[in-house]
Amino acid sequence: MYKRQAKDSPERIAPGKILGQIIKIGFPSACETALYNIAMTLVVRFMNQMDADGLNVTARSYATQIANFSYCIGAALAQANAILTGWHIGAKEYDECDRGTRKAAIYGVITASCLSITFALLGNYIVRIFTNDVQMINLVTKLLAIDIVLEFGRVTNLVYGQALKTSGDAVFPVVMGAVFMYLAAVGGTYFFGLHLGLLAVGAYIGLASDECIRAVGMVLRWKSGKWKNKGLVD
């Protein structure tokens, strides 16, 4: 009797269907990660062409290491909000999804911006953890200043992007990434960094542009409400 009720329960989902749902979200997300890694490989390749001593690519490495503290905040909020978003979508509580995602983005942007501004202001001292070279310190400090804008876009991108994936709208972030990671990040690194001669500063302008453009796209997609019709659970 119990087994029959469990089998006929509308809440019971076949393993094959669950696997299909996992692939529906997981495969596009994997593609986005692969596209990002390829894009960053091209960025590093261009930065290696900026000088023979590797000053610019090393400066980016230092700046990235410092900025990762800001990134951790955004990533944590994005993951936490994604879990809550999944719950609310399952309960058809779309207004709660919207409010929660908006709050997570606001808190993330404020926290990441405060950290980024602090790192930029104290960059002259923080970079000395890695090196005492004056030229390197000055360059990394400039990159940390640009990183304020980059983190603003990246946190927004993370929160709204993860929320879209959780809702089942996993293809849109991949399309945005495929277009703008290569146009803005890779193309910007080449144009601003090599063509205009801004070197690592130019590369960071391209990277910041990529994050901010994709962030705007994620927010607009979320506000369009199209994700409400892409839920994995009926």
Regions found by a protein language model. Give the residues of each.
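Short alpha-helical transmembrane segments in multi-pass integral membrane proteins
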Residues: K3-F27, T85-L150, F192-D234
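Juxtamembrane/interfacial segments around transmembrane helices
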Residues: K7-P10, E32-L35, A39-M40, G74-N81, ...
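Hydrophobic faces of transmembrane alpha-helices in multi-pass small-molecule transporters and flippases
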Residues: E11-L42, Q65, F69, I73, ...
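Transmembrane alpha-helix boundary and packing residues in multipass membrane permease domains
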Residues: S29, T33, T41, R45, ...
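Alpha-helical membrane-inserting segments
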Residues: L35, A39, V43, M47, ...
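Small-residue-rich hydrophobic transmembrane alpha-helices
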Residues: V44, V57-G123, R154-G177
